[in-house]
């Protein structure tokens, strides 16, 4: 996709397709220093145990991954990491999560950045890392309501801070939430496509 189609994409879809096993969710850690054997773990994801189903809803909203918006967000995050003096935003997120006052640590991190757009992108990335960690814990403990709230918070951050949703995604998420979904969020690269609920 990167070389042939000119789309600056990641590897989430490919990893999920090739490495996930039935009844599990794939927890993928994309830090560059990890090998393919180190960067993935299978998390038990037995929805039947809770009488739940995971729905994937295609909004039919077209999107293009080669229009530069994905690459622009990635470049903004890489520049933010450079400004913060860290190898990547995962390092910043790890520092924030270890702080005694995480809210203050996040505020100080964002205050070090030069513009509102960069602050929003970084806020999404570092809070999303913590949401993923919290989701894994909540689901492992059987706290489906907390897991659903984290799904919702993820979508809200993707809409407000990372700015990759479109009206069709937001409407589909809203409809799912109003009709009994514990949580709903967009999935994929954004700017169209599908939600999961």
Predicted regions and their residues:
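Glycine-rich, mobile lid/loop segments that gate access to catalytic sites or pores
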Residues: 1-8, 14
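C-terminal nucleotide
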Residues: 18, 22-183, 197
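Structural motif
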Residues: 193-195
